[in-house]
Amino acid sequence: MEQNEFGLVEKIVYLNRVAKVVKGGRRFSFSALVVVGDAKGAVGFGLGKAQEVPEALRKATERAKKDMVQIPLVDGTLPYEILGEFGAGCVMLKPASKGTGIIAGGAVRAVMEAVGVTDVLAKAIGTNNPHNVLRATMAGLTSLRSAEYVSQLRGMKLEAPRK
């Protein structure tokens, strides 16, 4: 895990070279998909496009930092099982007991490491397109609600508060 000077974890999920065919030949550009998190519950992702790789990465990282969201975590895992969907991508995320580790692949693993989840079971269903899998993962994570928040919505008191 790469940590920058602000203590943020940056992960490159996908780097793609695309070609535009013009009269003189092919013109290449790059797109980068990056996940940024603080490993304490905040995570964001960004897509950057440019003529050069470093510029695409910079743009993606900037966008990811700008769009960070807070995710409720319970002892290094998720509070409950969740299903995130985006396009054809569907990601199932299950909380796991301590010591399990991150059992996930590709884009899902990058997001989990950036957000600070240490134990989780995940399965990407439907597509293996990194863009859709990443957005499905983020959709699932952003729909998570903490026990405190739900009890406040219902106007009830928690018997045993959870961390």
From Swiss-Prot:
SUPFAM superfamilies recorded: dsRNA-binding domain-like, Ribosomal protein S5 domain 2-like
InterPro entries: Ribosomal_Su5_D2-typ_SF, Ribosomal_uS5, Ribosomal_uS5_bac-type, Ribosomal_uS5_C, Ribosomal_uS5_N, Ribosomal_uS5_N_CS, Ribsml_uS5_D2-typ_fold_subgr
S5 DRBM domain segment(s): 8-71
Superkingdom, taxonomy of origin: Bacteria
GO molecular function annotation: rRNA binding; structural constituent of ribosome
SS bond list: none
UniProt subunit comment: Part of the 30S ribosomal subunit. Contacts proteins S4 and S8.
Record-linked PANTHER family: MITOCHONDRIAL RIBOSOMAL PROTEIN S5
Family in the record: Belongs to the universal ribosomal protein uS5 family.
Protein role: With S4 and S12 plays an important role in translational accuracy. Located at the back of the 30S subunit body where it stabilizes the conformation of the head with respect to the body.
Official protein name in the record: Small ribosomal subunit protein uS5
Organism of this sequence: Nitratidesulfovibrio vulgaris (strain DSM 19637 / Miyazaki F) (Desulfovibrio vulgaris)
